[in-house]
Amino acid sequence: MLETDYVLAYYHTKPFYPVHIVAVPKKHISSLITLEENDHDLLLELMGIIQKIASMMTEEKSGVITNSGAYQDSKHLHWHIVFGKPLK
């Protein structure tokens, strides 16, 4: 869907929403709470990609979500950009 040298955004393989996009840094970062100071530029680029995608979905039912701890299934930092009512 969208890719830079450091960030990949793709359509979720098992979507929970009509539009369900996942944005990840290509560098392994396990979660939001493990970010280090030298990751700030990467995080800014990731947020820019998320903002670009989210700006395409301006309806009421949209969101940008990240999880940590027990709620984080994939142990790689990622954000879900979603639109519409949940499918399930």
Residue ranges and their predicted role:
Residues 1-88:
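HIT superfamily nucleotide-processing domains
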